[in-house]
């Protein structure tokens, strides 16, 4: 019951954050009036690969770099990050379920193995789908380096940790119960913390 309450609390907070809409057209136009560049100076490698000046989207001609299409990219970014957020809560629910099932399995309830494995596969698919949405979304307008620790930086640092832990959890499944369990709890702890720090 507390797990359901926790999940619904996270989901409700997420819904509230969707109401904070920005006027993308005004932001883009204001930015381009003062800056000739339509792209930020700093981008994640995956964003640069797809959306950089010489990225795949530019070379294929699907998204030439111009003001009109940059506005569409920012709308696409917003949609991808909203979906990333929704999938993130579904993944968190899967991780909580896995924690309960995994603990029971660890304590000798072998009949739960197939269920644990199936939910583990679903949770992994949702996790890596959500991660891809974030990593491959078009870049923001600006990405200036900020001094000190803030919620976005903390979210990114924790993302590095839970991504590594999720890879380890999948690699260690069926190989080392003790290490698999440690990786899974590390993934859950850092993932849940990443959601919390991003909201507050």
Residue ranges and their predicted role:
Residues 146-154:
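Juxtamembrane helix-capping/reentrant segments at transmembrane boundaries
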Residues 77-106, 115-138, 153-174, 180-200:
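Hydrophobic alpha-helical membrane-anchor/signal-helix detector
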């Amino acid at each position: 019951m507390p797990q359901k309450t926790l999940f619904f609390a996270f989901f409700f907070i997420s819904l509230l954050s969707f109401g904070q809409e920005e006027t993308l057209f005004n932001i883009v136009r204001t930015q381009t009036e003062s800056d000739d560049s339509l792209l930020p100076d700093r981008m994640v490698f995956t964003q640069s690969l797809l959306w950089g000046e010489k990225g795949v989207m530019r070379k294929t001609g699907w998204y030439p770099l111009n003001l009109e299409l940059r506005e569409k990219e920012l709308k696409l970014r917003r949609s991808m990050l909203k979906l990333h957020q929704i999938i993130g809560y579904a993944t968190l629910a899967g991780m909580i379920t896995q924690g309960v099932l995994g603990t029971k399995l660890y304590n000798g309830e072998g009949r739960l193995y197939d269920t644990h494995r199936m939910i583990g596969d679903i949770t992994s698919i949702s996790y890596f789908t959500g991660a891809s949405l974030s990593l491959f979304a078009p870049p923001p307008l600006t990405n200036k380096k900020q001094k000190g620790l803030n919620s976005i930086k903390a979210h990114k640092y924790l993302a590095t940790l839970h991504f590594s832990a999720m890879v380890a959890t999948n690699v260690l499944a069926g190989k080392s119960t003790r290490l698999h369990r440690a990786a899974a709890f590390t993934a859950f702890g850092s993932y849940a913390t990443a959601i919390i720090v991003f909201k507050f």
